[in-house]
Amino acid sequence: MYSINRLLSITIGNNRSYFDVQYVNIAMLVWGCVFCLIAGVGMILSKNFDRRKRLWMILLQFATAVLLLSDATACIFRGWTGIFGYWIVRISNFIVFLDNNIILYLFHRYVCSFIFTEQEERTLKRATFINILCAVAVALVIISQFTDLYYYYDAQNVYHRSEGFIISIFIPVTGMMVEMSFLIEYRKKLSNITISSLGSYIILPIVAAIIQFYFYEISLIDIAICNSMIVMYITVIGEQNRKLDNLEQKQIKTEAELEISMVLNQCIAELTTEADINI
């Protein structure tokens, strides 16, 4: 039975600095996964949300949790030889690439839930473009499993990028730019804090993708996606609390006005009665 230190040592080799980087990477991925699971469950238990927004937020959190767990698993078992190591590394990396595109689609639906009705969403050309783009991206991930389009493995079962890896980055970035066009065009329908939180999913992963071309050891893109999910979750909870507070204040105001109205009616009734008696 391997201890966790022994497991990580086998996975990342004997280089101490590389070990430290990978240990931090795995820890961030696992804790990010835990947070997204908690956020997803929290949204399930919360009932005071718009139905569409709540659905897509739940799916986004769980999809991100799967992404982070798969990436952590791929890191832990990198370099394992044998049947188990062979399959676990391949399945994990496949899910990572596949899930990135699924999350883009879910994010698109989440953005649309803020701006459009379901009927309006179906008629948008850009929405159709995103749907097609995500379908093509998923198809390419499947094809890459047989052609080494995005990545390949050496004899030690270690993952390496292929020349076509840039395609796996270009497709999501294209989709994110389309989503940014929605946020800019329909910004008057959104609060500033909502625009900022939704924009974090676009800006953070793009910045992370640029950095990751030069800093290969940490899963910066996936961590950036996780951070954006944290921002979106905190924002949606804050916005909902603000709306509930406004409703509570309106209810208090309405009750006060009703009480004043009842007192006035009672006073008028008493004055009318006294006038009738005097007559």
Model regions and ranges:
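Membrane-proximal helix-loop-helix units in multi-pass membrane proteins
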Residues: 106-109, 115-174
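PAS/LOV and related PAS-like sensory modules
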Residues: 253-279
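Hydrophobic alpha-helical transmembrane segments of multi-pass membrane proteins
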Residues: 2-6, 28-110, 128-146, 198-213
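Interfacial "cap-and-anchor" motif at the non-cytosolic start of specific transmembrane alpha-helices
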Residues: 5, 182-250
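First transmembrane helix
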Residues: 13, 17-49, 58, 168-183
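Membrane-interface helix-boundary motifs at transmembrane edges
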Residues: 44-58, 112-126, 183-194
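Alpha-helical transmembrane segments of polytopic membrane proteins
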Residues: 23-34, 90-101, 160-173, 222-230
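Membrane-interface interhelical loops and short amphipathic "cap" helices
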Residues: 10-18, 78-90, 152-157
